[in-house]
Amino acid sequence: MGLVINKPLHIKLENVLNHLSIDIRNETIKQVPVLMGGPVGQEHGFVIHEQKHPHENEVIISPSKETLRQIAQGKGPKRFAVMLGYAGWDAGQLEEELAQNDWVIAPFDANLLFEVPIDERWQKAAALIGFDITKMSDFSGHA
């Protein structure tokens, strides 16, 4: 399972919380964008957030409505992202795509998810491994 972190949907967290009948006491979260986590199961929501006592570069992925309730009440994690859907692959499909160089792999960086504006995440992730996206060809293969 994978989660896309740079594709905002046209809905805000307020819409999701209202749909789930969760009271909002933390007004600052109403306009938080909801992300498209992937094309599969878009009726399923996920919250990626820091732990209560954050360890360097560790996050929790939770499908819990209770996590959203805590966030809405101002008692939840301060750094979080909410998404609907996920990316999924059949057995062996991801490995095949990796072997065909269809993916560029970068190390996880929690600050990329929580601190970088959504529209800059792709470029910043590529920069973590020394890529300049503007110089990348749209053709893949083996040299």
PLM features per residue range, with description:
Residues 1-83, 87-143:
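A short aromatic-anchored loop/beta-hairpin motif
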